[in-house]
Amino acid sequence: FFSSRSRHTRLLTVTGVQTCALPIFRRAKARGARVTAEATPHHLALTDECLATYDTNFKMNPPLRTEEDRQALIEALRDGTLDCIGTDHAPHTDYEKDKEFDFAPNGILGLETALPVCLEVLVKQNKFKLAHVIDLMTRRAADILKLPAGTLAPGAAADLCLFDPAEKWTYDAKDGFSKSSNSPWTGQTLTGRVRLTAVDGRVVFEDGKILR
């Protein structure tokens, strides 16, 4: 799958890796191939059992898999086979999603729920260190994309996110900041909420309000 040229060519796999590909990535990394891959919050949290009702807000690509697959992705994050967490944020209109399951488009919202979902699945349920999860969602992704972000090092831009890891709140996509509402977490109680966001030192979001 990966030739010797992979050491000189970088490959980034996005939108989540399927479990069957994990051994390939492990072998490639062991050979020194420059390959990186991400996991998504929804593939870490949900399984194909969610599809029983044919709710199109659970339709995505790659599709949801079994509980065994979900656990394999979590362990791949733990051992470094998977390099970072990406939201695969894919908004769609209500009109697009309000179709028969086979005809509705793939994709769900991911930005507003990524943090609480990862805190629940990785930190609370699977005993990841909080600092590790933050690193997977910030610095690791920035490093892969060669972006000067994801760090609080001297001289770095003050791009900050302050959150309360213990705050419980009920998510409703209709009240969210996206123009779309295709989220599988609508109506669910989540734990962990962003309270403030700063971009280059300027506060742009605080206590549920966009300031600029």
Question: Where are each of the predicted segments found?
Answer:
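Residue-level signal for inorganic ion chemistry
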Residues: L11, E38, D88, C118, ...
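C-terminal cap of metal-dependent C-N hydrolases
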Residues: E100-F103, A157-K209
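His/Asp/Glu-enriched, well-ordered alpha-helical/loop segment
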Residues: N57, R78, D83-I85, A90-A166
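Short loop/turn motifs at secondary-structure junctions and domain boundaries
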Residues: S3, A141-A142, T186-T189
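Histidine/acidic residue-rich metal-binding segments in metalloenzymes
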Residues: V17-I85
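Histidine-centered active-site/metal-ligand motif
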Residues: H8-T9, V17, H42-H43, H89-H92
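Single conserved hydrophobic/aromatic residue that forms the stacking wall/gate
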Residues: F1-C20
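A short acidic, glycine-rich active-site loop
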Residues: F58-E68, G107-G110, S183-T189
